[in-house]
């Protein structure tokens, strides 16, 4: 499963969501790769800390190879690096990506990332792609390479306005390049349950037919602490409420995905245009119960093991 976490508005928690879902996947037994397409390298730093600046080769090296004709080209897995977390790898970013964009667009290399990640599918159960917060070559490459898309949503008017334009961009990619791309849902981030505006905004999205995922992710200072320690929440704060929400979100996504494959023999198509009136009339499968999904006494976590 190749899953892109996409929003062309910055500050909505895109990298945080991608890395924490990836970490929960890995902690649950899956083999996971995070692909950091953002020249800022936030996901790379989150997973490997300051050592991320020294990693070589990186995605910039991969795209250099795409632009050139090396005598002995590296295979995609040669650009991958391990992290200190079991079963969790990273294909790291580099600031040079920003300088490569124009050349890659001019030579129409937009399918090269997809080709590389399809080759890596054999080694991983999940590939999480973190593109830049803008609609550019790297973002389009990510949407073409992905099988599914998660959309982070921060509860403010700017995010809501951007959301509908974003769905149009996804639909254009589906029409022109990647007909199989599905929208798994909207991930509500930094949610304040006691504030009226966030509640109203989320309810409006639901009323308009958008697939809003549950649980909503709470706002917490623990996110910044986990950034500082370069340890996703499942490793840095395993018992925290927000960590439990990430576990439940991952479980809900997995349940939905596995049920869809079981029922139809193929991936569930949740693609939609803005203001789509109906995605599905069936109730979504429940997430794991607290006894299955949440940390228990003694710091251990009970899991439903991932089965590739």
Q: Could you say what each language-model-derived stretch is?
A:
Residues 1-308:
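P-loop NTP-binding core
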């Amino acid at each position: 499963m190749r899953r892109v976490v996409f929003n062309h508005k910055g500050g909505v928690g895109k990298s945080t969501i991608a890395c924490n879902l990836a970490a929960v996947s890995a902690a649950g037994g899956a083999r996971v790769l995070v692909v950091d397409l953002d020249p800022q390298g936030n996901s790379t730093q989150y997973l490997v800390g300051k050592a991320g600046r020294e990693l070589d080769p990186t995605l910039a090296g991969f795209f250099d190879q795409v632009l050139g004709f090396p005598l002995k080209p590296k295979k995609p897995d040669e650009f991958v690096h391990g992290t200190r977390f079991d079963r969790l790898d990273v294909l790291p970013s580099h600031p040079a990506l920003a300088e490569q964009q124009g050349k890659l667009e001019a030579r129409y290399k937009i399918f090269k990332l997809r080709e590389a990640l399809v080759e890596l599918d054999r080694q991983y159960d999940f590939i999480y792609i973190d593109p830049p917060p803008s609609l550019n070559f790297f973002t389009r490459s990510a949407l073409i390479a992905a099988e599914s898309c998660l959309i982070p949503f921060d509860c403010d008017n700017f995010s809501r306005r951007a959301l509908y334009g974003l769905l149009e961009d996804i639909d254009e990619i589906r029409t022109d390049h990647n007909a199989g791309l599905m929208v798994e849902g909207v991930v509500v981030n930094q949610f304040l349950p006691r504030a009226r505006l966030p509640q109203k905004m989320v309810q409006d999205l639901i009323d308009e037919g958008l697939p809003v995922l549950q649980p909503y992710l709470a706002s917490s200072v623990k996110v910044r602490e986990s950034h500082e320690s370069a340890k996703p929440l499942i490793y840095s704060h395993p018992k925290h409420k927000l960590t439990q929400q990430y576990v439940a979100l991952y479980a809900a996504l997995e349940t939905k995905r596995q049920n869809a494959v079981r029922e139809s023999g193929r991936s569930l198509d949740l693609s939609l245009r803005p203001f789509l009136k109906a995605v599905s009339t069936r109730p979504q499968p429940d997430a794991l119960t607290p006894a299955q999904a949440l940390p228990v006494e003694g710091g251990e976590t009970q899991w439903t093991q991932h089965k590739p």
